[in-house]
């Protein structure tokens, strides 16, 4: 996994059982940079899901519509 993918997983584990908003994850991951493409987080989440599915962890990261992500 890439550094950013690991940071996303770390953040989700740190807040396990809670819904993590996209904004909170983006702020943590990219340290409040002025501009981050809206699609950047989605791409990283998709890549993490694909890698986890390859080892049998399907649906490990759940999307909560209009709220964010949770484990």
Residue ranges of model-derived segments:
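Positively charged, aromatic-enriched patches within helix-turn-helix-type DNA-binding elements
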Residues: 1-44, 52-57, 65
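Signature for phosphate-centric chemistry
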Residues: 48
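Minor-groove-contacting beta-hairpin "wing" of winged helix-turn-helix DNA-binding domains
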Residues: 60-71
């Amino acid at each position: 996994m890439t550094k950013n993918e690991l940071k996303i997983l770390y953040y989700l584990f740190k807040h396990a059982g809670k819904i993590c908003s996209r904004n909170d994850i983006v702020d943590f991951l990219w340290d409040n940079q002025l501009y981050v493409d809206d699609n950047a987080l989605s791409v990283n989440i998709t890549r993490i899901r694909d890698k986890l599915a390859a080892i049998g962890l399907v649906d490990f990261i759940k999307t909560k519509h209009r709220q964010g992500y949770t484990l």
